[in-house]
């Protein structure tokens, strides 16, 4: 999209320049002959204007690009200029020469457009060659193909301001160009990765609005402007692509770039599984989670959007998620597949991203997370929800120098467990030792009662809480790829649980009174602390290859709960 603006701006500016220089001494060209449009009379200067524009494009691009115009319609009385069916193509010989001279840009493009319209070219413009003032310009239906290849000799050039080069090339014959507004509508952008020809990125229905464009000596170094525009907004809608495993689609409803702020806003971002739940599960090679993510609004601040589009780098000083839902579903009736790799913790996944990543701050605002699990033994689905999640992750990166500077990613968040109970979590991920997966976690939860617990306990744990209340609970855990250890501390009173059994006839759960009597009489410790004795058991668990990160932590916490309550761990925690 960046090159779309540059070329659109070039077209607009050189079209204006050509129109204003159509006096005899200005319309002379060095090596171009009028093409496509034939002069109807000695007074019809359109072929000469086209030739002049072609010369300017050639000179401005050092011979790389060739401009073709099918039709040019100047209207001096109405102060208008229309360019119909234009094309900018590549001179392959010049491209090879520029590459040999180490002057070829990383992005080479081909543009076709249906119409370019310019308003507000008045008498003042005609009288002052060195100054151009235009009311507005519009470019309709452009199709832009960009062929991207990162060239090592351009690394230093990338540090320079693109606008400076553009200024130097355009301002050789004039002192000032001012355009009130530029509008580009219904554009199509297709990005080709030269190194990976099969990787194609396509954006449809692109809209670009640029206001208060001023090119003169006062703006050539103005970092607050984007391509000399005081304000520039780029938008595209309905961008969709599949994930590499073909299990999901990523859908982005609208992408907006406020260019001078280096700010990208994405509305209605979604990760959707393909097909129905049954169709999705048929594609799996074994038991796995199914994810669905919906984010109404995502804002990336201080981001290099062109590097992001070209998949070269993901850098943002701050990113905000506003609202949204993350749903995770698993089906225990699906057979286990092959053992999963033991390197899929959050910080390990970031390290696997094939491009440099640095998100200094990631904020969540009112996020909702839903975990659902189907248990074939109870023939029911248990659901755990965490709502009103607000928190911050800091220093998300895979860049070695950044890791040496600060070797940790941290995450702190607050939420409502089951829509009611306040809870807080804090994670610390060791980036310097990411291979072993080192991390620590602290979990704190407020009051729990049977109304909150039973919707989870009955379908997933096959027990129901008859009486009891937890006043508070905390867990501190440290671990890696293979083991977790830590402590779990819960304060509760008057605990009484009832095991459940399946009714083979109706598939319903019924109370198992014999087990209930035995459990509450022999095993269950119905309060903690008991007197002055606070049970705070140490916990050590080994990781199952099929466990994800959340299930791994939950196993450790559940083990601590069982030890505190006096329930044999093997009755609750199952190793698969």
Model-derived features: positions:
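Extended intrinsically disordered, low-complexity coil regions enriched in Ser, Thr, Gly, Ala
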Residues: 150-155, 196-203, 332, 337, ...
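Interface amphipathic segments
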Residues: 201, 217-257, 262, 266-282, ...
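Extended terminal
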Residues: 4-12, 17-25, 29, 34, ...
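C-terminal/domain-terminus segments
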Residues: 11, 200-212, 318, 378-393, ...
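Sec-dependent signal peptide cleavage junction
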Residues: 22-56, 153-168, 173, 340, ...
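Flexible beta-edge/linker motif
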Residues: 42-151, 167-189, 193-195, 202, ...
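Glycine-rich, small/hydroxylated-residue low-complexity segments
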Residues: 132-134, 311-333, 347-363, 367-370, ...
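Flexible, surface-exposed loop regions and adjacent strand-edge segments
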Residues: 151-159, 334-340, 461, 504-510
